[in-house]
Design a protein with these regions (language model features):
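Rossmann-like dinucleotide-binding domain that binds NAD(P)(H)
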Residues: 1-62, 68-73, 152
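A general structural signal for well-ordered alpha-helical segments in protein cores
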Residues: 5-6, 131-135, 161
C-alpha cells in the first residue's frame, strides 16, 4: 500500500489533512518467476495490487503516491515534486540517496531548464540506507533523543494506510486526525 512512498512524502510535506484513494486488483492470478517457487501459480484476488493515493495538505498543496505490485518495470522518477517555479525530480532509487535533478523556470534569475546540482551534501549516517529506521531507533534509545522517524510520524502514516480501504469502499475523501 505504499508505506515507503507515504513516509517519504509526509517527511517532505508534513502531515496530510485528507486522503483519497482508488485501488484495483489488476492481476488476480500471478505466476512466480524466480526462486524456489518459480512457475507456481498464485491467486491474488483478495486485496488491490495497485493503489493511487492522493493526500490533501490544504492551502493548494497535494501529493499523489502511485504504488502496487502490478508494475513490471518503470523508468519514471521515484519521486517528483512539482512547484510553482519548477520541479524537483529523483530518478534514482531513494535508498541510494540520489541527487535530484531540478527544473527551474525563473524570470528573476533568467533561468529555464533542467540542472543537476554538483557536490551534494553528505548525509548523516543515520539516514543513509533502507534500514536506517532501526539503527536510528536504537541510537535514539541509547542516547535518549528523538528518532528521525518519530512515533507520531509513524502513527500518521499508519492512519493514512488504515483510512485507504474505507476511502476506496466509499469512493470519497477521508479526514485525517493525527499529526506529527
Amino acid at each position: 500500500m505504499g508505506v515507503h512512498g507515504l513516509q517519504i512524502v509526509t517527511s517532505i510535506m508534513g502531515p496530510a489533512k485528507k486522503v483519497a484513494c482508488m485501488g484495483k486488483i489488476t492481476t488476480p492470478v500471478r505466476v512466480a518467476r524466480s526462486g524456489a517457487i518459480d512457475g507456481m501459480v498464485i491467486k491474488a484476488d483478495k486485496i488491490p495490487d495497485q493503489y493511487v493515493i492522493t493526500l490533501d495538505y490544504g492551502d493548494g498543496r497535494m501529493a499523489m503516491v502511485d504504488t502496487g505490485f502490478s508494475q513490471k518495470a518503470s523508468k519514471a522518477p521515484m519521486l517528483e515534486i512539482f512547484c510553482d517555479k519548477g520541479t524537483i525530480s529523483f530518478s534514482e532509487p531513494y535508498i541510494t540517496n540520489p541527487v535530484p535533478e531540478i527544473y527551474l523556470d525563473s524570470g528573476e534569475f533568467d533561468l529555464r531548464g533542467w540542472m543537476k546540482p554538483g557536490n551534494p551534501a553528505r548525509l548523516p549516517s543515520k539516514i543513509n540506507n533502507q534500514c536506517c529506521c532501526l539503527g536510528d531507533l536504537v541510537r535514539a534509545i541509547e542516547k535518549d533523543t528523538t528518532p528521525v522517524l518519530s512515533p507520531e510520524h509513524a502513527r500518521h502514516v499508519l492512519e493514512i494506510m488504515c483510512k485507504i480501504p474505507e476511502a476506496i469502499e466509499k469512493g470519497c475523501t477521508m479526514d485525517l486526525e493525527t499529526t506529527f
